[in-house]
């Protein structure tokens, strides 16, 4: 990984832990250039990408597909049910096969944390791996689009007060963002049910009472309640959660006029956030979705630059 002539070069993108501040800022600025129509890009040769999603996805899956098409890549969509995965083939052997067929980039989402390690450490797999989310582990492209959205608003990260609220322990978005936001100089707070908080967050910020910190916040980043990762016997009340931990209309009145509201989506309206606030003037949720395409264009360009530099 490196930055040369203002352009980031990546071999793979699996975790925010692997990115430097210079690389992050380079990707943000390149994504902004794509968004403004000021980025020149042309493929030197035919390039193939395959999107392997083993968990449901709308935003990540389709924005990667659109980003790939905008860059001129040939896209091979992958249906696990129609593939040899349904016959018992492993993910490793599937990627080994795609690599042998000539696929250059595999974008993968899996419910298995760290699935990518055996792929990037293999001597026989040469295609680039982009992590589209691994269980409750990491979601680097979501983190980068979140950072782009924050940077568009404030032009900095240093000193910003940011709360990440909700289903923390099950959230790959929280874990990706907390690592990089702290490195970039933001001051982090975590809010939500105590049962969904763990000591791993202590090194990055402070567990806080939402009502006490709301008036100080620059960014309120909400997280989806991830029922699919909870124990089946865990009790949950939508109304109770919204009342005690959600961004209600009354709580939103406590925010500074300059504060912004974020959510990686999908949004559970009237659970994490009041329905009326999702598309409110302070919300940047739709902007996050749009920025996802440009951020992923920047990621893919960096991957291609890294392959070319080998």
UniProtKB/Swiss-Prot annotation:
It is an enzyme of class 2 (transferase). GO terms for cellular component: cytosol. Keywords: Pyrimidine biosynthesis, Transferase. L-aspartate binds at residues 87, 172, 224. Pfam families: OTCace, OTCace_N. GO terms for molecular function: amino acid binding; aspartate carbamoyltransferase activity. Pathway: Pyrimidine metabolism; UMP biosynthesis via de novo pathway; (S)-dihydroorotate from bicarbonate: step 2/3. It catalyses: carbamoyl phosphate + L-aspartate = N-carbamoyl-L-aspartate + phosphate + H(+). It comes from the Bacteria. Carbamoyl phosphate binds at residues 59-60, 109, 139, 142, 265-266. Its EC number is 2.1.3.2. GO terms for biological process: 'de novo' pyrimidine nucleobase biosynthetic process; 'de novo' UMP biosynthetic process; amino acid metabolic process. InterPro entries: Asp/Orn_carbamoyltranf_P-bd, Asp/Orn_carbamoylTrfase, Asp/Orn_carbamoylTrfase_sf, Asp_carbamoyltransf, Asp_carbamoyltransf_Asp/Orn-bd. Belongs to the aspartate/ornithine carbamoyltransferase superfamily. ATCase family. Catalyzes the condensation of carbamoyl phosphate and aspartate to form carbamoyl aspartate and inorganic phosphate, the committed step in the de novo pyrimidine nucleotide biosynthesis pathway. Heterododecamer (2C3:3R2) of six catalytic PyrB chains organized as two trimers (C3), and six regulatory PyrI chains organized as three dimers (R2). This is Aspartate carbamoyltransferase catalytic subunit. It comes from Lactococcus lactis subsp. cremoris (strain MG1363).
